[in-house]
Amino acid sequence: MSDNGSPAVLPKTEFNKYKIGKVKSTPAIQRDAKTNLTYIKLRKRSSEKVYGCTVFQNHYREDEKLGQGTFGEVYKGIHLETQRQVAMKKIIVSVEKDLFPITAQREITILKRLNHKNIIKLIEMVYDHSPDITNAASSNLHKSFYMILPYMVADLSGVLHNPRINLEMCDIKNMMLQILEGLNYIHCAKFMHRDIKTANILIDHNGVLKLADFGLARLYYGCPPNLKYPGGAGSGAKYTSVVVTRWYRAPELVLGDKQYTTAVDIWGVGCVFAEFFEKKPILQGKTDIDQGHVIFKLLGTPTEEDWAVARYLPGAELTTTNYKPTLRERFGKYLSETGLDFLGQLLALDPYKRLTAMSAKHHPWFKEDPLPSEKITLPTEESHEADIKRYKEEMHQSLSQRVPTAPRGHIVEKGESPVVKNLGAIPRGPKKDDASFLPPSKNVLAKPPPSKIRELHQNPRPYHVNSGYAKTAIPPPAAPAGVNRYGPNNSSRNNRFSGNSTAPNNSRNPVNRFHPETNVSSKYNKVPLPLGPQSRYQGNSNESRYKNSPNDSRYHNPRYVNKPETNFNRQPQKYSRQESNAPINKNYNPSNGSRNMAGDHHQGSRPSHPQFPISPSQGQHQLTSKPIEKKNGSFKDERAKPDESKEFQNSDIADLY
């Protein structure tokens, strides 16, 4: 610097004569007054750049978030200059260590060296929030780095879970060939992917599959793979065994083997291939130990011939199980014999018996019908792993709003709503006291011993399915003979009914209670009740409700007997005696003033109660056409009476109930 303070002019030298370019500005040299030292003052640039990276501002814009992983987050972005959609993978920088992640370094390095149509392409690196250059200790603090990748419309996980996408076998073969092509290129470049799964297989708008997410990939030692042996076989190099997502982890990794090869990627391809058919991961272990059990349940416990090295691995105790292989039973409905052989060789327990990517491309399964398609056509809808939750919610909502299907046996015509038609009144179900719900000790309808049947001459508290038990088991006492509780001159009550019988028409006369035209009982009548279709206490008390004629109705009004136009909509008795095969009693004459209560009277069984037949020794207590004669000023019933020696005892009732 000159004395007047103007910048010093550099003298012309031989070097300046050959200098290329033009010096934009001469640095200003300043002197410190305290130390008397000269120094050059540096000016801060408008934008601090990182070598090989592009600044984020004014170049890219973030849109929606596509997903999040262990080592970063993925966003959908737009390149502002070209307005093209890109995928931006944000790299998480640890604040404590202030170091660039080793996984990101490996991924960037490997992607820069790979160039294949089935491998994702790294466009460039982007950063934002430039730090203060005076703070050298925090060069990466508050700085975000992005990996700019081409935007893919779908990944294989979202495609398989999308209910609106159905892949044919020809499309599956096309996808498998593309996966094997990309994986073979990686292995031949002496890299292991170590994280093959459906979420890391991307699909572009042209149906081209691309392997992505090389965060766990690394260089392996040894020879590259060939048609027989995997890459790195026999090298003796050790790697970490905590790699690959658990559900896609090879059995040698589960057992703790550290000297693994590129065969761990082939196992993941086999899991992806089986997932095409079940639409979900096929080996979903809950823990690392449980993952081994799940694998051996599908492929069987390895024997000495299947996998000789397994018993020398750290997790060899899992090989002591005794599981049978179920691969054929599980996937036999989806694949042919050739397809099962292809899947079995991809999922071989011994890594040295597993197919390589180079040999798998030439398997006979790809040459049988149907042949692989030339191009995969996917719908315009985007399908990513982040959309799986939405697919499940839509599926649950559609199932809850689905119209109920038609019942079995009902044919839905065209244009008809698949609902059950109105079938009218449905019969009532059995009551809780039904015989089918009672134990044998309390079941009245259960057949008692034969001795009990012969001793009974009356119905023991009749029971019906719809109405239950009768109100009483023993008839009430009747009035003495000849006693008229309404008086002998009560003609208004005596002329209420008319019939063909010669007996008086006194409906309240206790003597006439058994007349065919009178069915009114009296508590003063001690005359034993006969058995027959006219007995009030025989069978079910509700059997008279639904008869074939209006006179058989319980609510019968005699005023409308002679009016044929009256419509009595009564349903016929369900268990009619007319449907029975029992012989009809020819002595019974319904035209003699007796009403047909529940069909014709059957011989050999009690009226309206077929469960308790009457033995011939007890007699057939039936109504006959013999009229009642009046003797000594009173009516006397000359009809057959039950044997007094066969009275119904209380002990019998107790035994029965």
Swiss-Prot record:
Q: What does this chain do?
A: Serine/threonine-protein kinase component of the BUR kinase complex involved in transcription regulation. This complex phosphorylates 'Ser-120' of the UBC2/RAD6 ubiquitin-conjugating enzyme (E2), leading to monoubiquitination of histone H2B, the localization of the PAF1 complex to the chromatin, and the silencing of telomeric-associated genes. Also required for histone H3 'Lys-4' trimethylation. May phosphorylate the 'Ser-5' of the RBP1 carboxy-terminal domain (CTD) repeats. Necessary for the recovery from pheromone-induced growth arrest in the cell cycle G1 phase.
Instruction: Kindly list the biological process annotations in GO that this record carries.
Output: DNA-templated transcription; positive regulation of transcription elongation by RNA polymerase II; transcription elongation by RNA polymerase II
More about this protein: Present with 2070 molecules/cell in log phase SD medium.
Give a Pfam family name: Pkinase
Task: Please name the CDD domains in this protein's record.
Answer: STKc_BUR1
GO CC list: cyclin-dependent protein kinase holoenzyme complex; nucleus
Where ATP is bound, by residue? L66, G67, Q68, G69, T70, F71, G72, E73, V74, K89
Q: What class of enzyme is it?
A: transferase
Q: Where, per the database record, does this protein carry Phosphothreonine?
A: T240, T405
Q: What is the effect of changing D213N?
A: Loss of kinase activity in vitro
| Protein name in the entry | Serine/threonine-protein kinase BUR1
Subcellular compartments: Nucleus
Residues carrying Phosphoserine: S400, S417, S634
Bias (Basic and acidic residues):
627-649
Name the reaction it catalyses.
L-seryl-[protein] + ATP = O-phospho-L-seryl-[protein] + ADP + H(+); L-threonyl-[protein] + ATP = O-phospho-L-threonyl-[protein] + ADP + H(+); [DNA-directed RNA polymerase] + ATP = phospho-[DNA-directed RNA polymerase] + ADP + H(+)
Compositional bias annotation for Polar residues: 535-552, 564-595, 614-625
Instruction: Offer an example of a GO molecular function term for this protein.
Output: protein serine kinase activity
Region annotation Disordered: where it falls in the sequence: 414-657
For this protein, the record's Gene3D superfamilies field holds: Phosphorylase Kinase, domain 1 (3.30.200.20), Transferase(Phosphotransferase) domain 1 (1.10.510.10)
The entry's active site is: D195 (proton acceptor)
Q: Which family does it belong to?
A: Belongs to the protein kinase superfamily. CMGC Ser/Thr protein kinase family. CDC2/CDKX subfamily.
Q: What is said about its interaction partners and assembly?
A: Belongs to the BUR kinase complex composed of SGV1/BUR1 and BUR2. Interacts with BUR2 and RBP1.
The UniProt record lists the EC number as: 2.7.11.22, 2.7.11.23
Q: What organism is the protein native to?
A: Saccharomyces cerevisiae (strain ATCC 204508 / S288c) (Baker's yeast)
Show the InterPro entries listed in the entry: CDK, Kinase-like_dom_sf, Prot_kinase_dom, Protein_kinase_ATP_BS, Ser/Thr_kinase_AS
